[in-house]
């Protein structure tokens, strides 16, 4: 259900950690509702038989982790996963309560962050260590520079180093559907699909699989797949793994294949009715899923707290809603997984803010899920020393590590060192001696609401009532990526756009004005929102009377598009007679092809 889309933007940094700290008590959803009583009945309906082929053991607790977030100042832009396209949410906008306008039902205590920010990753790893999580399963897409895959890979590499410092384990959920997306986006040819996946597994073998912190099952490196969705034949995977030794321990989703070594489950939102997944239906699914795994020697079970996505509010389609129910949904799904005696319990997810399946602390949910995981760890390991109160320390360490006081940064480093040593007593003593205050309340980092406003920008061209000759006219382009067609650049909607195929230069855009006219001005616009950051596009302008012979009117020229300076629009003087007008793009500092949200032409 993961959505992989792209907006290419380059933005200027803003202050995201200045501003205030507000004390917020986490919401108690339905405080008058007896969720525990309701779920006691649901637990009685769980019918998970003792597995014939799996012994009782301590499963690894691994959090499914999304390394796909981008934010200033670490990155030049807010990535797609914080704004979901920007038509409804703009992280540059600060709401009245100090939160950034992000595409999520939930708000991280740190505010929107970058997955390559060491301060954020240290904070997250410390929380995992203190809650009893053994490591993470990275959502990972290979090593190609396509869409945001390169950024995801770079963030994963940074987080792996931090996890290893904390003695935490890691594995990968490889999404083979990303190869399909690369083919559809013309990043690779269809014939190169197998070799692209093979490249990813070769990289993992060379850099991760032999690592002592990489999770192994049956002596082989654990690899999950959210599918398979593209490579569905066993022979394809055998070719992909031909040079990988030992062969990965391959785990598909929900019995998708007959050749995987094991399977894992996920919130079954396809079973929703009327937009809602009812608990009895969830219980029936859990009984069915784990029943099918009874005779299998290995299992990855999954625990999830809820499913509350933002997709409908962002302009898309929701997958449905699974109620948090005061934390009882998480307890139910964890209990079901534990009864099945899995090798791994996958916590879904640490931080998928789009789908709303988060256990990372948020303003809305506080630390509830991590407290439960801590309880489960103490049940398995009574000597586990970290407490509920200790979970409140990392946000204060993050605050110090992200600040400018070198003494506080040093104190934070010392406390982090004690956390990854697992020394709860030293953590508490150092925190007290550093004068760090913390309590059971939620203390998010919020902005000053004064940061919000985007100044008015004067239009680069005033048509003075003249008709846009290009509006709705036929367009021919040399290439496009996905459904970003040429027609979207003449539809009068700045939220839609044309973009050429990746690295297929030059990118040509030709519009037929239907009849010849004396042309005076062409206007090229991008979305004016700040998530479409400053960039330079090199454009040549050509004209024609017959669509056969084109004359270069303006040679290749770099034009600056800047939402803060010109509203992401440029005006090009023409002064010519023509029916057809062609733009040839040869460079774009903000994307891998030409981009136009609206192309307007005016004349006499």
Label the model's feature ranges:
Residues 1-11:
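Bacterial N-terminal signal peptides that target proteins for export
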Residues 30-462:
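Glycan-processing catalytic domains of CAZymes
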Residues 57-59, 78, 166, 211, ...:
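Residues that flank catalytic or metal-binding motifs in active/ligand-binding sites
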Residues 462-478:
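Extracellular carbohydrate-recognition regions
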Residues 479, 484-554, 564-604:
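Aromatic, loop-rich ligand-recognition surfaces of beta-strand-rich domains
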Residues 558-560:
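Surface-exposed loop and turn segments in beta-propeller and other repeat-based domains
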